[in-house]
A protein has these predicted regions:
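Short amphipathic alpha-helix with an adjacent loop that forms part of the alpha/beta core around
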Residues: 46-50, 96-107
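Substrate-recognition element of Asp-dependent hydrolases with the DxDx(T/V) motif
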Residues: 1-26
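Short beta-alpha junction loops
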Residues: 14-16, 40-42, 78-79
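A structural micro-motif
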Residues: 6, 33, 54, 70-71
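Conserved Lys-Pro-Asp/Glu-containing loop-to-beta segment of HAD-superfamily phosphomonoesterases
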Residues: 37-67
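Acidic, Mg2+-coordinating phosphoryl-transfer loop and its flanking beta/alpha structural elements
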Residues: 55-95
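Glycine-rich phosphate-binding "P-loop"
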Residues: 13-15, 28-32, 85
Length: 109
């Protein structure tokens, strides 16, 4: 549903073999998404990807803190790696969609 209105890019960190498998899976299952792989060998986080004027969704708090996105959403349940996140949290994709609609209504996009 979101892909009908927005450009969706999946940014994932990992090692080369892991990123190759993720890319194949995304191409097969989410062909409407663009994939950017960030190799842990070269970078330690996703901050090298320009997310200006974007909504960044991740389940890892440190990745949410280290980017230039206009909006950051911590996705999913509370875990050790995101328990300190105090910003916006969405527990499912319906909540994400509703939050995006809220942003649009406010004209803050």
């Amino acid at each position: 549903k979101l892909s009908e209105k927005y450009n969706i890019t999946i940014v994932s960190c990992g090692t080369t073999p892991n990123l190759k498998l993720k890319k194949i899976w995304i191409e097969d299952n989410l062909p409407f998404c663009r994939f950017i792989g960030v190799n842990f060998k070269d970078k330690s986080d996703k901050s090298s990807v320009d997310m200006n004027n974007s909504i960044f969704i991740d389940d890892v708090a440190r990745f949410l803190d280290l980017n230039n996105a206009k909006y950051n959403i911590c996705f999913g349940d509370i875990y050790k790696w995101n328990e300190e996140w105090t910003g916006k949290r969405c527990y499912n994709w319906c909540e994400v969609e509703n939050y995006i609609k809220e942003i649009e209504r406010k004209g803050d996009n």
